[in-house]
A protein has these predicted regions:
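Acidic, PIN/NYN-like endoribonuclease modules and their adjacent C-terminal/linker elements
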Residues: 8-11, 35, 78, 93-144
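Short active-site oxyanion
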Residues: 24-28, 54-57, 98
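General small-molecule cofactor/ligand-binding pocket signal
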Residues: 29, 59-60, 130-132
Length: 144
């Protein structure tokens, strides 16, 4: 989502959501997994992540999140090449985050994939996790 701030296709909505975080309209939650991925990103993305990390709650990888990741793999929710994406969702699920926000339409922000995660979560005793794109979440161009 942070990288979307610098992508012509996604910047309007990504920056709108970043403004929402800065205005404290929503609580931002990041993770150690996000930080590790950002290390490989362009400098402007790393700089924005550093700024946002000051506003955010940070989630560390826990045994419970790793267990849930293994369950997602066992349920074949996603292909194993998307292990980090499943870990993001496991971390958010275990932490009872309200919404996971992503621009990854290929295998996350897609109804059938969301239903797979919800099904696995319910079967394993976790609540469903809402998954949306920044455009669906930001208050940009809406009355607040």
């Amino acid at each position: 989502m942070i990288g979307g701030c610098f992508d012509p296709e996604f910047r309007t909505w990504s920056n709108g959501l970043i403004d929402d975080f800065r205005a404290r309209r929503f609580n931002l939650v990041l993770s150690d997994v996000t930080a590790a991925e950002i290390r490989r990103a362009p400098a402007q993305v790393r700089e924005l992540h550093t700024e946002l990390a000051e506003l955010a709650e940070n989630l560390s990888v826990t045994e419970e999140a790793l267990y849930l990741l293994e369950q997602y793999e066992a349920h074949r929710v996603l292909d194993s090449r998307f292990r980090n994406d499943m870990l993001h969702i496991a971390l958010a699920t275990v932490a009872a985050v309200d919404v996971l926000v992503s621009w990854t339409f290929q295998h996350i922000v897609r109804l059938d994939m969301i239903q797979r995660f919800i099904g696995a979560n319910l079967e394993l005793g976790y609540r469903p996790l809402a998954i949306y794109s920044p455009r669906e979440v930001t208050t940009y161009e809406r009355e607040v």
